[in-house]
């Protein structure tokens, strides 16, 4: 939340772990493109309320939500998404007791448990610095689970719809919701936020189940960047 981008190497693979609080978009990308490893930083700019990144090698600008270069020498290039999960620390610790957690060099420099966006994700809130059209039939700040179900085809499910059913199956995808994760954008402290639950999206393939990339973002974000995407609405 405070730094928005972490350049790291995990399992020998250079990755960029990114988060845009204004869109609640948490995405992980491979940093290798055309044989070159890119290092990413924040431009300080927004487009449709979403973080615009840049790479230090070519100074091209990248849209965080889509992973596409929108300005510069790499215009039109796309970063490959890495499957990841936005989940509570408790769930992570239970799944990986020996898992490693990134901490700053000086943890006391900033209160990382504080939320500078108090009540930003309330259903009736207005997206910050957004000038686009809102989707119909759903509040713009409703959380949705966005997935590229097939190459170039995007769908999203209203989180309330998934929470009500607990599981949604579509094609070879299985989308699940379980309670136990605090919203980072609700209360003054991250741990004090209301429960928005944990989401997983997996694909059944050849008798195996594999995680696939997804994002739990706001409805206005999905509509802005995937205007032709299908949005499944449930009860508000």
Predicted regions and their residues:
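Mid-to-C-terminal functional-domain signal that highlights helix-capping/loop sites
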Residues: 1-236
